[in-house]
From Swiss-Prot:
Protein family according to the UniProt entry: Belongs to the TRAFAC class TrmE-Era-EngA-EngB-Septin-like GTPase superfamily. TrmE GTPase family.
Enzyme class: hydrolase
Binding site for K(+): N230, T249, V251, T254
An annotated GO BP: tRNA methylation
Signal peptide: none
The protein's name: tRNA modification GTPase MnmE
Record note on quaternary structure: Homodimer. Heterotetramer of two MnmE and two MnmG subunits.
Reported cofactor(s): K(+)
Binding site for (6S)-5-formyl-5,6,7,8-tetrahydrofolate: R23, E85, R124, K455
Protein encoded by which gene: mnmE
Organism domain of life: Bacteria
Amino acid sequence: MYVQDTIAAISTPTGEGGVGIIRVSGRHVLSIADAIFKRNRDGGLQSHRFYYGAIIDPVSADCLDEVMVVFMKGPHSYTREDVLEIQCHGGYLVVQRILDLVLQQGTRLAGPGEFTKRAFLNGRIDLVQAEAIIDVIRSKTEKSLALAQHQREGLLSQRIARVKDGIVSSLALIEAFIDFPEEDIDVLGIQQVGAHVDCSLTELETLLAGFNEGKVLRDGVSVVIAGKPNVGKSSLLNTLLREKRAIVTSVPGTTRDLIEEVVTIKGLPVKLLDTAGIRESDDRVEREGIKLSLDKIPSADLVLFIIDSSLPFSSEDQAILDVLAPCNFIVVMNKSDICRSFDMPQLPDVPIIAVSTLTGDGIDALQDAIFEAFIHNHAVDSREYVAVSQARHRDALQKSRDALLRFRGNLVAGMELDLLAIDLRDALSAIGEVTGETTADDVLDLIFQRFCIGK
């Protein structure tokens, strides 16, 4: 449990705005409203109704601002406690003065994510849904927002609940065999246990298989644009950004520093890095830029290898291709509007896309190829699509899966029932780490510290 005091914080961004909101949660919100909120009509505040009035300092009788106030009676509120929200004008000083006045009434300034933490501790949401709230706030694309919304709505929690139900059913049968040793353990009972575990394992494997796509949709990917000088790397960056971000000239070696920009490609957050042209150079500054380019390639999620298709495939192209051999890359043959002058080496399983940054031909196909390099599940646009997107969830689900696999092996080996029950309890505990049922307090603190104050 937690100290059930009354907390308050500003819930809107700092600075000028149309509206500022101060949120208060706890058992004393009505007495606070009585002390500082004045309106023309008598009577108490009814739940879930807006009231117009003014915030008055009870000591000086100064009017701080005209406001709208809404009271939400627990448990029908965000935190499941009594909640008061004060909506005032959005200037920094106005909002801060009202918060200070609220704090003077015996409330405490809320910590980061403390309102959401109370919603979790009071059973309104589980930990998966709580973490999804911050993902909703931080989403940069439609697909990452949809994934976060589905998690917030409980779709992932429902899938995890199915895993838990199978483990609980198996554990109940095993413990029944332990508690009633006089009853013979029949083959049908063991088969029933195995069937429950197999269903949970299948669900776990499905969830884990979707982690890479879920993480990509949530966090995005890094894509390096690489190639020799003057093949159109900066032109491609500008084309994908739909703006002139990089200088484009006919002089080889114009780009010497890394240029980094973020763009959305088919709903996927992509960090693009335009790099210096890779070649042998006597220029010290250019050599440093080339070194930076080569250093970025191994850590990239994807490399776009740009080739000038109007020129013969050169030894410089081959040298870059050799560097890219262990990487995930797409060959982009630029200047497709000019007659092609070379034959590409055979590259099995490597997408080769012809584009023209001058005319825009092939850019849609390139964007499709970038998206499909990471997302293979066409259900990502479904209203029911849900995926594991956080490493914490993946790690806990892997622990649960490993415990179930261990149980499976021990069951076949004829191990004692007490040992089998330990495996199932381990699997159940790992599942509880995801939803927050068995999560350590220090882990909870770290999770909610990622939130802003006021949420």
